[in-house]
Amino acid sequence: MSKNERMVGISRRTLVKSTAIGSLALAAGGFSLPFTLRSAAAAVQQAREKVVWGACSVNCGSRCALRLHVKDNEVTWVETDNTGSDEYGNHQVRACLRGRSIRRRINHPDRLNYPMKRVGKRGEGKFERISWDEALDTIASSLKKTVEQYGNEAVYIQYSSGIVGGNMTRSSPSASAVKRLMNCYGGSLNQYGSYSTAQISCAMPYTYGSNDGNSTTDIENSKLVVMFGNNPAETRMSGGGITYLLEKAREKSNAKMIVIDPRYTDTAAGREDEWLPIRPGTDAALVAGIAWVLINENLVDQPFLDKYCVGYDEKTLPADAPKNGHYKAYILGEGDDNTAKTPQWASQITGIPVDRIIKLAREIGTAKPAYICQGWGPQRQANGELTARAIAMLPILTGNVGISGGNSGARESTYTITIERLPVLDNPVKTSISCFSWTDAIDHGPQMTAIRDGVRGKDKLDVPIKFIWNYAGNTLVNQHSDINKTHEILQDESKCEMIVVIENFMTSSAKYADILLPDLMTVEQEDIIPNDYAGNMGYLIFLQPVTSEKFERKPIYWILSEVAKRLGPDVYQKFTEGRTQEQWLQHLYAKMLAKDPALPSYDELKKMGIYKRKDPNGHFVAYKAFRDDPEANPLKTPSGKIEIYSSKLAEIARTWELEKDEVISPLPVYASTFEGWDSPERRTFPLQLFGFHYKSRTHSTYGNIDLLKAACRQEVWINPIDAQKRGIANGDMVRVFNHRGEVRLPAKVTPRILPGGSAMGQGAWHEANMSGDKIDHGGCVNTLTTLRPSPLAKGNPQHTNLVEIEKI
C-alpha cells in the first residue's frame, strides 16, 4: 500500500469495503456508519473533488457566477456565488436555474465532438467526420478564393450573442476573435444594429444623443414606476440581473408600479399595482392620449420644455420645420393630420379604456419623481423607432429627465467595471448593412442601396455575401425571421458559397454549415467576464477550465490561430502577436490594472473567482450633468438639447425611399403598420402574434435541456375569449399559421394575454422536415415572423405578425 493510499489511519481499500458493508446495513435499517468511517469517507470525497469558478455567459444580460464541483474530470454538481454578506448593494450573484443546469449542457449527449463537413443538402443535418487539418485547410482555401474572386466585402461575420460576456470567447461580431482575424486579412462586411435593440438604439439618439437611462436601484427615490413592456423577471431574473434590485428598491420607496404590456408577465406577477393590457404596436398612441391630458390639464413642465428641449411648441421649433410642425400641435390636432389625440382616440387604438388613460395621465403628471421606462419588446415592432421615441415623451413632458428617481424613458442603465477586450483592430472594409438584412445581401446584395436598404459607407453594395462565419450563434436560422424563406436562400449554394459554423451542438443553424467545428464552452477555458445589467454593483468573474479538453473540441482562439497560419505567416503574427490565450488575458488584465489600480491582481482575482464593486456614486442618473448645466454639458444632438423635433429625421424622411405604409417622422408620432391591429389582413389572420423571452431559455441557449423543457413547455398563449371561439381548451394541440409557415404546439388558454393577441416564447429549436411539409413541431416563433425590416433602423420587427390558430 503506497503512502498516497493511506488517509487518517484507514486505507482506501478498507474504506470502500467498510462503506459497502455500512450501506447494506443502512438499507436493512440495522445501524448507521460509525462517525470515524463517515469522516474518512468525507475526506476521500474532498480529496478527489475540486471547485472551479465559472460563469453563465449567455445573452440574458446577467452573467452569473457558477461554482462547479469537479470529480474525476467530470462536473458532478453546480452551485452559485456564495461570497460576501449578501446585502442589498453587495449581494451574491446567484445564477438562475438555467445557469445551474449547465452540467447538463456540458455533458449533453448531443455535444459536437469532432470537425465535420456537410455531405447532404444544407439544412438536412447530414455530415461526416473529418480531421482538423482538412477542416482548417478547407476554410482557409475557401476564404482565399472568396477574397480573390469577390473581395473582402463578400465575407460576413454572422450576428451572434451566444457568448456575450467573454473576453477571448466573446461572440458578438464587432468584438469577437473572428473579427480580429478578418481584420488581419483585409476585413469583412460590417453590420450595425442588433436583434435585441435595433429600433430603440437607432431612434433614441435622435432625441437624446444616446440611449441612457437611470439605474434600477434609483427607483428607491421614485414615487411612481411605469414599465412599458419591460419584463426583467424573465429576461434578467437572476442575481446578476435587476429583478432583485427592482424589488429591493421598491421596498425602500414604496413606489406604485404600473405594468403596460399585452401579456401579464412574471415581472407583474403580484409585484405590480396595476396591469394595463395593450394591443401590440400601439404604445405610441397611448402616449399621445396621455400627452393630450397632460397638456389640457396643465400638467406639463413648461419651464423644462422651454429650457432643455427643441420642438415642443412654436417657441422652440427649428427654423427649417413647417408651421405647426411641433409636438403640441400634433397632439392637439393642429398639425397635418388634423386629428386631436384625445383619450377617446387612443382608446380605440390601444384597447385601454378612456377613463384609465385619463387616470394614468394624471398619475404621471402629479407623481414626481416618476421612473418611466421601456423594455425592448415594444421597439421590436415595425413602428418600433416611433414607439421608442414616443415613450420617452412622458418623462420629457413632465420634467423627469436628469433627476434622481426619474428616468429618460429608456431601459435601465447599469454600473460596470470596464474590461479590456481582445482588440479587433481596424476593418479596412468601411461598408456596413443592418444585421437583419444579411439574407437580402446574399440574395440580391448589389441591388441594396443606402436610401432604400440602409447600406452605410457607400451608395450600394458591390457584391453579395459569399462566405459566412457563424460562431456561437443561432441567428443563421432559428433566431432570424421567416425560416422557410431563409432556408430557400441558404440552401442555394450558388448564392452563399461557404458557411463555417463553430458550435457546441447541432443547432438549427449548424445544420446549414459546410464546415462544422466543435467549440469549447466558456466554462471549459480560461477567460474573464464582467457583469452586464446589474444595477449599481459591478463585478468580474475569473473562469478557469472546469475539465480538460475532451474528444477533439477546441477553443475559438486556437481554431482561428490555425486558420491564420494557413492564410500566411504575416496574418498569423498579426493575429496572435505571439501570445497564447492565457498570455492575452494576462496582457489585457495588466492594462486594466494600469487604468484601475483598485482591482485585485491577476493572481488574486484568479483565486477569488469573483470580485464585486458598488457604484461609488450610488446610482446612475441619466443626463444629470445636462440637467444641472445644459450649456456646459450639452447632449450629443445637433442642437445640444433634447430634440422632440429632429431636423435630421425630417431630412431622412424627405430623401429615403419608403413604402407607402412606412413612416419616418421628425416627431414621435403614432403610425399604423403592416400586419398591425388595424390591418386588412386580419380578416384572414385575425390574431396578433408576438414572441417573448422565455425563462427556460436565453434566446435558444439551453433550449435543448430536457429538464428545462419539461418545467416550461413550449406553448402558444391565447385568451379564453379567442380560444372559446375556436373550440380550443387548455393543453390542446393547435396549429398556428400564416402565409409564411405553420407551427404545431400545445395551447395555453389564459387571461394573462389580451383578447386578439397571441404569444410564443421565442428561442424554441426549429424542428421541421424541410424537404417535406416544413411544418415546425419545435414551436419556433420565427417560422411565422416577417423578414420585412423596420423603416429607419432596418431592424427586425419580429413582434409584428398576424396568424390564425386552429385546433388539430
Residue ranges and their predicted role:
Residues E497-M498, P545-A564:
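Phosphate/diphosphate-binding loops
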Residues R263-A367:
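Long, well-ordered, tryptophan-enriched scaffold segments
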Residues L520-P545, P755-G756:
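Catalytic or ion-translocation cores adjacent to nucleophile or general acid/base/metal-coordination motifs
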Residues K323-N324, K328-I442:
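Active-site phosphate/pyrophosphate-binding segments
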Residues S160-S161, K307-V310, I364, N407-T418, ...:
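A glycine-rich phosphate-binding loop feature that marks nucleotide/adenosyl-phosphate handling sites
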Residues S2-L299, G325, K466, Y471, ...:
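N-terminal export/assembly segments and adjacent metallocofactor-ligating motifs
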Residues I556-M608, S700-Y702, D706-W717, I721-I808:
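Long, contiguous, secondary-structure-rich segments that constitute the structural scaffold
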Residues S2-K3, P173-I260, T267, A285, ...:
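Extended redox/cofactor-interaction regions of prokaryotic respiratory oxidoreductases
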